[in-house]
């Protein structure tokens, strides 16, 4: 069964073969929110992230690209409900700025992602363009947005 939220996925429990890719986001805002979730989740339990997600969404300006791209990490860290990890918060701001650049170049993030032929190439590009994204995070993100790193 396809899923919307990453924590619904058995992939998160290392059972990759039993989980279909997630649903493709409808908006760039959703693409950024899912990337942010994958980054914020690293090192935390899914249960904790699931419980805290409404607070994180509010603290991080609903992951609206323009607002987050113009925020400062210091200001976000002071907001109620924000995760208190300065490196992750700085990555959220930098990644929103990168989304802005990609949208200026390609119109939408989805259109940009479609220009990358293979899932493996997409994984590499995500690691190069975005902060706090390593191989596992890139692979998991692609899975969550409906694309497999194993696509030809």
Where are these regions (language model features)?
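Short amphipathic alpha-helical surface patches that mediate protein-protein
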Residues: 54-55, 97, 143-146
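N-terminal polyanion-binding entry modules of DNA glycosylases/AP lyases
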Residues: 1-82
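Short helix-capping/linker segments at secondary-structure and domain boundaries
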Residues: 42-48, 99-107, 146-150
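Alpha-helical ds-nucleic-acid-binding substructure associated with the helix-hairpin-helix region
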Residues: 59-129
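Non-catalytic, well-ordered alpha-helical scaffold segments
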Residues: 29-33, 54, 86-93, 139
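Generic structural signal for hydrophobic residues
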Residues: 56, 122, 137-138
């Amino acid at each position: 069964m396809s899923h919307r939220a990453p924590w619904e996925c058995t992939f998160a429990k290392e059972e990759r073969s039993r989980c279909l890719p997630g649903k493709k986001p409808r908006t760039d805002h959703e693409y950024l929110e899912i990337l942010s979730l994958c980054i914020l989740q690293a090192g935390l339990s899914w249960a904790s992230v699931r419980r805290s997600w409404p607070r994180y969404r509010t603290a991080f300006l609903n992951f609206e690209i323009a607002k987050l791209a113009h925020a400062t990490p210091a200001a976000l860290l002071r907001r109620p409900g924000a995760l208190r990890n300065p490196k992750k918060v700085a990555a959220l701001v930098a990644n929103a700025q990168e989304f802005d650049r990609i949208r200026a170049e390609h119109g939408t993030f989805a259109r940009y992602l479609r220009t990358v032929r293979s899932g493996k190439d997409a994984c590499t590009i995500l690691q190069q363009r975005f902060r706090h994204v390593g191989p596992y995070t890139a692979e998991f993100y692609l899975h969550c947005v409906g694309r497999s790193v194993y696509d030809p």
